[in-house]
């Protein structure tokens, strides 16, 4: 189905905790610390960030998929590493994680989270930064930081409320309770819930569908939706019209609209 799953090599260093493979134009990043339920250590965060950055720069990757090995997507932060840190150290650690999540959110390419198991704390924060979330029936999601005497540190309080609303976000965060996949879908936290064995096939099918369309239009759409988060509707509508108009100088606009007028059934975009 895909190129052989491999560890990622950056600057001569093998990163064993991150696996990367390409399936046509889909990049698949697999978190691979199953012995710790893929807990986020500082080194692991850096490995993920480097791999995401490389996938973003790869012109052959149109859509990025994130998933985990074993029982966990990401089960949270590595508490053993985090426990002895002081304020300056933990601020630096959380800054690394925040940079990763900001990159996922702002990168032009769509990012899909295939939540295969536990997505807790920092793991849910990673998933929240993705554009689309599919979950297995066995997945558990939550932000349990209050149970440890702390709060989210890489965007959880900011993104969860935007996705599920303030009241539900506050209940989840104030109680630290984990919810199951069906509840996550009910509140709009995930798009779809599937049996474990159907999760990746469904995610790849979705990614393949996105890959079929003009990527300039896909990326312009993501920019406009992201812009709406921080601007009023007048500013957002102007920004949308600007991106819409810019696409009328592209080959893809001529190919897409021309193909529609000619009633072509299989339009091949060139992404330029």
Residue ranges and their predicted role:
Residues 46, 50, 60, 68-103, ...:
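Glycine- (often His-adjacent) and acidic-residue-rich active-site loop
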Residues 43-47, 96, 103, 202, ...:
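Charged catalytic carboxylate motif
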Residues 8-69, 102:
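Conserved CoA-thioester-binding segment of acyl-CoA-metabolizing enzymes
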Residues 29, 33, 47-48, 66, ...:
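Terminal peptide-recognition signature
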Residues 11-32, 177-209, 219-228, 256-272:
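Amphipathic alpha-helical segments at domain termini/boundaries
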Residues 103-216, 249-250, 255-258:
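Crotonase-fold acyl-CoA enzyme core
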